[in-house]
């Protein structure tokens, strides 16, 4: 039971600290959505570089963003995503879509990449292959899917986690869309978010 409770706490923290308010404009259904496979491939490559290779070295992640010509988020943008927790973020104008990258400070030290899409990616094999390579030999255990509602966003999360010398390291995928009462044909986009989180309690 203790392990299950820890997973729920980790998921709740990631959702509450990273999901934006359910602004209708954010979830407008794309008129000309990009090819899902191409968008996923670009997102996976960005996540691999920033969140799996550079992170948890925050300065290395920042250098990666600078090299890509990413635009730093304003304080207001960062607060809308991370609430009162310390962190920073960047907007990335990708080839297929806009991506947002955030680095959240401890104790829930996390690197996240998110994008909006017309629907959840139909084939997550490229992400699964990347996660499997990263997790190889690390005694990761799967959890989820688990659902929650935060700020009128219906969110589903799943991933893998491991306990390592008093800290918990997780790879997670979140899908968020407006709750049913706010969702209609013009506002049905899905936020897709990949998160690498390292939780080290004080």
Predicted ranges, named:
Residues 2-11:
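Bacterial N-terminal signal peptides that target proteins for export
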Residues 26-104:
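N-terminal leader/targeting segments
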Residues 151-202:
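Glycine-rich, aromatic-bearing surface loops/beta-hairpins
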Residues 12-18:
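Bacterial N-terminal signal peptides
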Residues 92-158:
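Long, charged/polar, surface-exposed segments that mediate recognition or autoinhibition
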Residues 20-22:
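N-terminal signal peptide c-region/cleavage motif recognized by signal peptidases
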């Amino acid at each position: 039971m203790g392990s299950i409770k820890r997973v729920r706490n980790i998921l709740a923290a990631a959702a509450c600290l990273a999901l934006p308010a359910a602004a209708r404009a954010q979830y407008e259904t794309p008129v000309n959505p990009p090819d899902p496979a191409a968008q996923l491939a670009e997102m996976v490559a960005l996540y691999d570089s920033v969140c799996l290779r550079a992170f948890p070295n925050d300065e290395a992640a920042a250098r990666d963003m600078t090299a890509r010509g990413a635009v730093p988020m304003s304080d207001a943008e960062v607060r809308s995503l991370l609430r009162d927790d310390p962190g920073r973020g960047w907007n990335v104008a990708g080839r297929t879509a806009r991506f947002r990258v955030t680095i959240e400070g401890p104790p829930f030290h996390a690197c996240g990449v998110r994008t909006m899409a017309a629907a959840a990616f139909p084939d997550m094999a490229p992400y699964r292959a990347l996660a499997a390579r990263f997790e190889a030999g690390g005694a990761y255990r799967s959890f989820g899917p688990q659902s929650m509602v935060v700020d009128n966003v219906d969110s589903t999360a799943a991933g893998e986690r491991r306990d390592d010398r008093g800290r918990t390291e997780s790879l997670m995928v979140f899908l968020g869309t407006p709750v049913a009462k706010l969702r209609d044909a013009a506002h049905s986009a899905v936020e897709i978010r990949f998160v690498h989180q390292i939780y080290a309690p004080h």
